[in-house]
Design a protein with these regions (language model features):
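Intrinsically disordered, low-complexity Ser/Thr/Pro/Gly-rich regulatory segments
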Residues: 1-224
C-alpha cells in the first residue's frame, strides 16, 4: 500500500546508516543499548506524549559520535556533540529502539530476492484467536524461516532471554509447523549458555559480529 511506499522511501534514505550498524554491529555493542533505552523513554508507551529530548550520561566520542553524526545528517536526530539528543519524530525514535535491525533485514532480503518475504508481520492463529507479531518471515520453495530481531542486551536476565527464544520457537511452529526454521538476529553478543538453550529449541543465532553473515545464512537456507 501507500504506507509501505512511504516506509520504503524512508528506509532507503537511511540505508547506508542501517547497513553500517548491522555490518559493524560488534563495534557499537553497548551504545545500541543506550540508544534503545533513550528511544524507549522518548516514545514513552505508558503516557501518550512523545518526549523527543533525551539525555546521555556522557558525550559520546569516536565511533559512537560518528554514528550520531550520520543520524544527524539524515535528519533523524538533533545533536550538538553534547549529551542531549532530540529525536526528530516518533518514527526516528522507533528506528533507534530497534527498527533499524528490521530495516537491515528488509534491505538485505530485497537484494537476495527469495520467493516471498515480509517484515513486521502480524499473524493470526485461528485455533487460539491470538494475534502475534513477527519481525520477519521468508518463504522459499515451500519452506518457512521466521526471524526475530533484538537490539537490547542479552545476559542480564536468563529467564527473559530464554523466554524470547521460546516465544520465537512457538511462533514459528504455529505459523509454519515444526519444519519451519527459526533465526534470532541480535545486535548484541549472546553467551554460550543462551546459545545452548536456543539449540534445544532449534533456534539459530547470529549475534554481534555474526550479523554481517545474514546474507550468507539466507542463501544457504534457500539452497537447503
Amino acid at each position: 500500500g501507500n504506507q509501505d511506499g512511504f516506509w520504503q522511501a524512508d528506509a532507503d534514505s537511511r540505508a547506508s546508516l542501517t547497513r553500517k550498524m548491522g555490518d559493524e554491529a560488534e563495534r557499537y555493542d553497548k551504545f545500541f543499548g543506550t540508544l534503545n533505552r533513550l528511544a524507549d523513554f522518548a516514545l514513552n508507551e505508558d503516557g501518550d506524549r512523545f518526549q523527543p529530548r533525551q539525555s546521555l550520561d556522557y558525550a559520546p566520542g569516536g565511533r559512537n559520535a560518528e554514528l550520531l553524526d550520520d543520524a544527524r545528517r539524515l535528519g533523524l536526530i538533533q545533536w550538538n556533540n553534547d549529551t542531549d539528543i532530540v529525536f526528530a519524530s516518533r518514527e526516528a525514535a522507533a528506528y533507534f529502539r530497534g527498527g533499524w535491525l528490521e530495516e537491515y533485514v528488509w534491505y538485505k532480503l530485497r537484494g537476495i530476492r527469495p520467493h516471498d518475504w515480509a517484515v513486521n508481520l502480524k499473524t493470526q492463529s485461528y485455533a487460539a484467536q491470538v494475534e502475534n507479531e513477527c519481525d520477519a518471515a521468508v518463504v522459499h520453495r515451500n519452506r518457512l524461516l521466521v526471524i526475530e530481531c533484538k537490539t537490547s542486551g542479552f545476559g542480564k536476565n536468563e529467564m527473559r532471554d530464554v523466554g524470547y527464544i521460546y516465544k520465537l520457537a512457538q511462533l514459528a511452529d504455529q505459523i509454519g509447523g515444526t519444519m519451519s526454521q527459526k533465526l534470532l538476529l541480535s545486535a548484541r553478543p549472546i553467551h554460550d549458555n543462551i546459545r545452548q538453550r536456543a539449540k534445544e529449541y532449534r533456534v539459530d543465532i547470529l549475534a554481534a559480529h555474526e550479523v554481517r553473515r545474514f546474507v550468507e545464512y539466507i542463501k544457504c537456507w534457500m539452497q537447503g
